Amino acid sequence: MKDSDKGRLKAAALKYDREERDAPHLVASGSGRIAERIVEVAREAEVPIVEDAALVSALLALDIGEEIPLDLYEAVARVLAFIYKVDVGSR
């Protein structure tokens, strides 16, 4: 996920493995050059990138490794559903 706020790129990366954890957790976040690198790595790995300014702002408040809070479940579920749809459609 990425967001350009006042010209400064912001990005956050989530991981979700049902067998590993109960909820998605933050694996990377940052702004500026760090955000650019997060987006670059995602593109290289062919990971879908979703833009959601409100969600990325909320995710930037989390610590790396922290599971998303309940109030973000719905927004993250929409992102995961979109990614699943894109992934299935590309097969």
Which stretches of residues belong to each language-model region?
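Divalent-cation
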Residues: 1-91
